[in-house]
């Protein structure tokens, strides 16, 4: 199978073809996703909550991400694999480069970092040194203590304008993808339309170029709080492979996320 690349997603945006992505943390699920044609995966620091049982993503280390990245890469050798740089792993551009090198050596194609204009120099440094970058704006879980919880971001003109400004700054610095999390649909559309790079939404309506879900949310195995934007595809299909196929089909057709999964 031909490898999925950043250029593949760029073509999807140009052709207005929505695409699905998902988090993955181990060999078996990565292989299952790849076998079903779901070829863009993120080793997210969400593993701190879903795999390790912490109440936030903050305890996750670069070594944790590298370990899971290597496992996912073995299961899905041709996928486009993103890996999070966890909390305090990119406080300076130099630190970001060192830690990005670790996860790239483990098998990542691209690193994802959370934050806006303050990251411009870091993004420039990474991309100049052949480390592709995915930005992450809106509800950035590593900032949960600043936000005072997991809340919708970008409501109101000033907050929305700031997020758009952040997105444009990241793109200008060299970011090649952007994740938008928990923002109003109207703002997600503004940002998606303004950027040349593909935008992947989670809790941002069906107006972005792609969608991502934490796999545990997509299969209803989180336990506890279920985010408004999540949908349990396993409950509807009763089979994990069928659930993956339905998730992809609903994203590609624009059925998911629906109005009930969106914020305004």
Curated annotation (Swiss-Prot):
Keywords annotated in UniProt: Cytoplasm, Magnesium, Metal-binding, Pantothenate biosynthesis, Transferase
Cofactor: Mg(2+)
Name of the protein this chain belongs to: 3-methyl-2-oxobutanoate hydroxymethyltransferase
Cofactor binding summary note: Binds 1 Mg(2+) ion per subunit.
GO CC terms of this entry: cytoplasm
Source organism (scientific name): Escherichia coli O8 (strain IAI1)
Sequence similarity: Belongs to the PanB family.
Active-site feature positions: 181 (proton acceptor)
SUPFAM superfamilies tied to this protein: Phosphoenolpyruvate/pyruvate domain
Binding partners and assembly: Homodecamer; pentamer of dimers.
S-S bonds: none
GO MF term (any one): 3-methyl-2-oxobutanoate hydroxymethyltransferase activity
UniProt xrefs under InterPro entries: Pantoate_hydroxy_MeTrfase, Pyrv/PenolPyrv_kinase-like_dom, Pyrv_kinase-like_dom_sf
Annotated binding of 3-methyl-2-oxobutanoate, by residue: 45-46, 84, 112
Keyword match Phosphoprotein: no
Catalytic activity: 3-methyl-2-oxobutanoate + (6R)-5,10-methylene-5,6,7,8-tetrahydrofolate + H2O = 2-dehydropantoate + (6S)-5,6,7,8-tetrahydrofolate
A Pfam cross-reference name: Pantoate_transf
Function summary: Catalyzes the reversible reaction in which hydroxymethyl group from 5,10-methylenetetrahydrofolate is transferred onto alpha-ketoisovalerate to form ketopantoate.
EC number(s) on file: 2.1.2.11
GO biological process, any: pantothenate biosynthetic process
Enzyme class: transferase
Cell compartments where the protein resides: Cytoplasm
Tree of life domain: Bacteria
């Amino acid at each position: 199978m031909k490898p999925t690349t950043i250029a593949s997603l760029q073509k999807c945006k140009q052709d207005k073809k929505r695409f699905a992505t998902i988090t993955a943390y181990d060999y078996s699920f990565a292989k299952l996703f790849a076998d079903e044609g779901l070829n863009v995966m993120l080793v997210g620091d969400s593993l701190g909550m879903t795999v390790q049982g912490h109440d936030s993503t903050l305890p996750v280390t670069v070594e944790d991400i590298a370990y899971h990245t290597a496992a996912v890469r073995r299961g899905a050798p041709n996928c486009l694999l993103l890996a999070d740089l966890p909390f305090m792993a990119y406080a300076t551009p130099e630190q970001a480069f060192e830690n990005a090198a670790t996860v790239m050596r483990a098998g990542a194609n691209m690193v994802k970092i959370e934050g806006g204009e303050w990251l411009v120099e870091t993004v420039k440094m990474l991309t100049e040194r052949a480390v592709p970058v995915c930005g992450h704006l809106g509800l950035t879980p590593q900032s949960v203590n600043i936000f005072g919880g997991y809340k919708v971001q970008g409501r109101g003109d000033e907050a929305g304008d700031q997020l758009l400004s952040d997105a444009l700054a990241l793109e200008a610095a060299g970011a090649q993808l952007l994740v938008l999390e928990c923002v109003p649909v109207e703002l997600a559309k503004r940002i998606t339309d303004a950027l040349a790079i593909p935008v992947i939404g989670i809790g941002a309506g069906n107006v972005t170029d792609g969608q991502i879900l934490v796999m545990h949310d997509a299969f209803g195995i989180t336990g506890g709080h279920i985010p408004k934007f999540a949908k349990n595809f396993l409950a509807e299909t009763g089979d994990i492979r069928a659930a993956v196929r339905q998730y992809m089909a609903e994203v590609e057709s624009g059925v998911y996320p629906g109005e009930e999964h969106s914020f305004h």
